[in-house]
């Protein structure tokens, strides 16, 4: 008799960044630390061939901007932002409908500053 055993936890890797169909983007403390995020920074995603890179487009600019980050609580280092355009692009790339829970790779630098590759091929 062959029993099919299954792990309750399955994949225990937590997402670094989560994109929702509503336009909400949740950013982990790990990503915030790599990008040195602070309240009011504006995020963007750059595409190079099939690679997607998260970076800080503007550091605490004046006025209201799409994808401007804010901390989710006083003590933590998690951030949240909102951008329908960024979410739509990522959800389409991942072939997801409601949300895409993703990891990021090791940061690289270029003329735009620090870039974090978003691993879109592997949904959590």
Task: List the predicted regions and their residue ranges.
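Mature exported/compartmentalized surface modules and terminal targeting/interaction regions
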Residues: 1-7, 11-16, 47-124
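The feature marks the first
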Residues: 2, 18, 27-31
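Short, surface-exposed binding/anchoring microloops in extracellular/periplasmic proteins
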Residues: 21
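Short beta-strand-centered segments at strand-helix junctions
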Residues: 24-36, 81-91
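Acidic (E/D-rich), amphipathic helical modules within compact regulatory domains
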Residues: 30-53
